[in-house]
Design a protein with these regions (language model features):
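Helix N-cap/capping motif at the beta->alpha junctions
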Residues: 30-39, 60
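Active-site beta3 strand of CheY-like receiver
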Residues: 44-50
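Two-component/phosphorelay signaling modules centered on CheY-like receiver
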Residues: 10-29
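Short amphipathic alpha-helix used as the core "switch/output" element in two-component signaling
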Residues: 39, 61-74
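Receiver (REC) domain active-site loop signature in two-component systems and cognate sites
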Residues: 55
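Alpha4 helix (beta4-alpha4-beta5 surface) of REC/receiver domains from two-component response regulators
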Residues: 17, 62, 85-100
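C-terminal output helix
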Residues: 106-115
């Protein structure tokens, strides 16, 4: 499985990558902002996107909307990561087509459960 991790903080990308490796995923790419993520998604084949909500210029919700509006990417599993579990944000993400939502900080076990839930539903 090829996973794209999108976060503007290198330390957070490193943490998520480390957690993914703990639960058995090795094929992980990174993007440091929403624009880079969209470029990588257009040229690459990914099985899952794990994307931070709060990023400058192109926030995670805009990445999600762009993915859902792209005929080639519209069914790509998408896990939104955020530091805040505001109900309005969760509802906006659900409306935009997010598969799962995870609040920082989280453990490898929580991440594993969210990923399993995405693929069990698919």
């Amino acid at each position: 499985m090829r996973i794209l991790v999108v976060d503007d903080f290198a330390s957070m990308r490193k943490i998520i990558k480390g957690l993914l490796k703990q639960i058995g995923f090795q094929n992980i790419e990174e993007a440091d902002d929403g624009s880079t993520a969209l470029e990588k998604l257009k040229i690459g084949e990914f099985d899952l996107v794990i994307c931070d909500w709060n990023m400058p210029e192109v926030p995670g919700i805009e990445v999600l909307k762009a993915v859902r509006n792209d005929p080639r990417l519209k069914d790509l599993p998408f896990l939104m990561v955020t530091a805040e579990a505001k109900k309005d944000n969760v509802m906006e993400a659900v409306k935009a087509g997010v598969n799962q939502y995870i609040v920082k900080p989280f453990t490898a076990e929580t991440l594993k459960k969210k990923i399993e839930k995405i693929f069990d539903e698919g």
